[in-house]
Amino acid sequence: MMFRKKRVKVNSRVAHSQRSLKKGDVLTLELPQDKDYGVDVEKGSITVLYEDAHTLVVNKDPFMLVHPTGQTKSCTLSNYVAGYYAKKGVVHKVRPVHRLDRDTSGCILFGKTKEAQQYYTDELQAGRIDRIYTGLVEGCIDSDGVVDAPIGIDPVFDNRRVIDEFGQPAQTEYTVLCHDGDH
């Protein structure tokens, strides 16, 4: 497709797919530029933890959605990331690589390009990116352990996940950091 759209050049000249490269040739690929953010742009406070030309990592506060859904179209992290891009004067479609539940806070990884988003998605699916959570539980867990069970959609609350023999494989290692009364 890039050849058809004349986005591949060798030595500043449009190249054809059969063209062989020689030592010293300069290959230039013109990647398509985003024309919009993909979500409504909103001003909002975000904390950028890391950023480079391909990647944006932002802290998600609790009680916020990562992206707009059927009923919630505004005040999401993605809307605020679009506002952040707009304030910087750049246009990147907002591409979250993963999500966190509404009530959960933590790092959200965004790809600034379709290629970066796909790369990080592939890395997550291959298990080469770790997700580490800190949580507070009610009751007393005596020792560290592993929950190795498939996760599926809760039949009662479709926005929750439960252990489900037909769900996706999942493994959670946990470490008890401390005990405090009933927690």
Mark where each language-model region is.
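RNA pseudouridine synthases
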Residues: M1-H183
